[in-house]
Amino acid sequence: SSAASDVYKRQVKEETKVEGMLIKGVAKDTDVAVLTVKDVPDVPGMSFKIFSLLAQKNINVDIILQTTGRDGKKDMSFTVPLGDAESAVAALKNATHRIGGGDITVDKTCAKVSIVGAGMQSHSGVASTMFEALFNQNINIKMISTSEIKISVIIDEADADKAVAAIHDAFIN
């Protein structure tokens, strides 16, 4: 990769430190695409078929969202690095006969914004504070992922800087 692209990646993954709080920082990542496979058969093994296919292509998957099954079908959305989006779509389209499913959509105008800290799942109100900060800026959340050390949301890339500032302010004040 070029020096310019390395600088770019450092910039988009910059972190804002939040001192003296449970939250250690706010991170932004714009190297994200959201893929959705519509109307996947709601039967055992479909997640394995989809994600093993991507693993064979060395495509890293981060956040996964699966809708509740209806009429024997469900939608599966997940994030991949922007540079892998097209090869992921191609791999999935080539395997439609194996995985079933309908249309495959890709959204390349997303960003992942995360708050990072320790023991977040055992402290009530952390996610709520983050979501309120986004709501107050009229920022729509497309996907959410939580763990013990991180809460991440997928939002429109155009809102990423505003989101980082709003979340930072919510936890500082």
Regions found by a protein language model. Name each.
Residues S1-Y8:
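Short, small-residue-biased leader/transition segments that mark boundaries at the very start
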